[in-house]
Amino acid sequence: MRILIVKLSSLGDVIQTMAVVPDLHAMFPDAQIDWVVEEAFAPLVAQVQGLARVLPIGQRRWRKAYFSATHRAERAAFHRLLQQDAYDAVIDFQGLIKSAWVAAQTRLRPLGFRATYGNASQACAYEWPVHLLLDRMVPMPARIHAVARYRLLAARALNYEQASLLAKPAQYRWEASAAMAPASGARLVVLAHGTTRPDNEWLEADWLALGRQLIDAGMGLALPHAGAAEFARVQRWAQVLGPQAQIWPQQGLDTLAQAMAASAGVIGVDSGLSHLAVALGLPHVQIFSQDRAWRAGPQGCTYQVAVGGAQAPTREQVWQAWQQVQTAYAQERPA
């Protein structure tokens, strides 16, 4: 069987969709699985174990000058790449026109199909015109966790919904080049403070207070950043917190994942890096400043927890949660 995953963006959603790959291999051990994803995320997706091909697409970049000669040539080259193989199943995990447009361009084997969501789910992006582009609409619950939604879409599209597999926690599997557990004695905590949504942010004063608590407990801090505003923020923090706070350079997502995987864990807001912490199997506290933990928070792991909800958590709640996950991690995965 040959299966194509179409999940283009964004970072957190792409990472959560990775849980589908082990499910597919459990049900179809000989399946060849390809993935179409935005070019910025392709190096990270290439680290997922069990993929045959990763097909990068430049939709975000193309939109800036859609009719330029260069972008027209790139789109034609991508179309040729997409047409190289025929698929038994093409599954659009995005449910948007931009992703259905990609899925609709694929070649199918005899009896092959193209599937996506048949309806919207709460707090999930969805565009109804996908019905006009693809041929199999899969009904979904009105309220469901994002990871469960991706896994259920694959299961219903490929007729294994009744398998006990879906009752088990999501799994993420990485190639050997992506470390899977903190290094022995790791003392560096990653503060994943960045987010594209202002309503997801946690107060800077609380981050600084938490940083001091971690340093007082003998930990170092890693400060990743993306963009000028986040870089200015971590520069301020490093000046206040001192040499124990390391500003990480901007780096590719695959390299960043390897650096995170060698840390003692991650404390972060609802963002792509927090979802990456979950997928890497790290001790993790995820901070929510709105009622979204039911949809996006970590599940099924004692050393990965969500704090907050309709209101942001206090710094003490985050600190207590961090101590909790450290204890749970030591019990479940002793050195």
Question: Whereabouts are the PLM-identified features?
Answer:
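Catalytic machinery of carbohydrate-active enzymes
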Residues: 1-335
